[in-house]
């Protein structure tokens, strides 16, 4: 998970044969946003995700913690539900490319892209190191 600038907020390494949506709540629970004053913020206000995360359970999880899910609906055969349909905020969804940029920045590191580290514990250490490098590059960039 990352913010709109592509700064990583939390991550979880999962097996390749598992769906990413299975770890949605785990990743959200690890988020700790630095505040301007006071305690750290434990929940974000909105979550941008692709169609793979469109499920009733994930939307209920977001509703429970007052998180606005911006997730496009899957194009599958659904029966119309009673009440107002969920609105989809397309302009806000356009900001979802931040996570794709983060993945491309992570894959610039050869050890992560080619998975040199065979043990999961070693691989889990390499990703935060790459994230630190990304944050430092964004913070101390000589470009404006």
Regions found by a protein language model. Give the residues of each.
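Short, acidic, Ser/Thr-enriched surface-loop or helix-capping motifs
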Residues: 3
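Active-site beta-loop-alpha junctions of metal-dependent nucleic acid enzymes
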Residues: 12-37
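Helix-centered, glycine/charged polyanion-binding patches within enzymatic domains
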Residues: 17, 36-119
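Catalytic-loop motifs flanking and including active-site residues across diverse enzymes
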Residues: 20-23, 98, 125-128
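Generic alpha-helical structural context detector
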Residues: 26-29, 104, 127-131
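Charged phosphate-binding loop/patch that engages nucleotide di/tri-phosphates or the phosphate backbone
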Residues: 126-144
């Amino acid at each position: 998970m990352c913010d709109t600038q592509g700064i990583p907020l939390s991550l979880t390494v999962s097996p390749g044969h598992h769906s990413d949506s299975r770890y949605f709540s785990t990743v959200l629970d690890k988020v700790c946003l630095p505040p301007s004053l006071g305690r750290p913020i434990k929940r974000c206000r909105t979550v941008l995700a692709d169609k793979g995360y469109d499920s009733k359970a994930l939307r209920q999880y977001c509703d429970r913690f007052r998180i606005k899910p911006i997730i496009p609906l899957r194009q599958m055969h659904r029966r119309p539900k009673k009440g107002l349909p969920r609105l989809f905020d397309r302009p806000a969804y356009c900001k979802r490319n931040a996570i794709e940029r983060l993945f491309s920045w992570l894959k610039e590191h050869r050890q992560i892209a080619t998975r040199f580290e065979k043990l999961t514990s070693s691989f889990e250490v390499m990703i935060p190191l790459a994230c630190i490098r990304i944050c430092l590059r964004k913070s101390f960039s000589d470009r404006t």
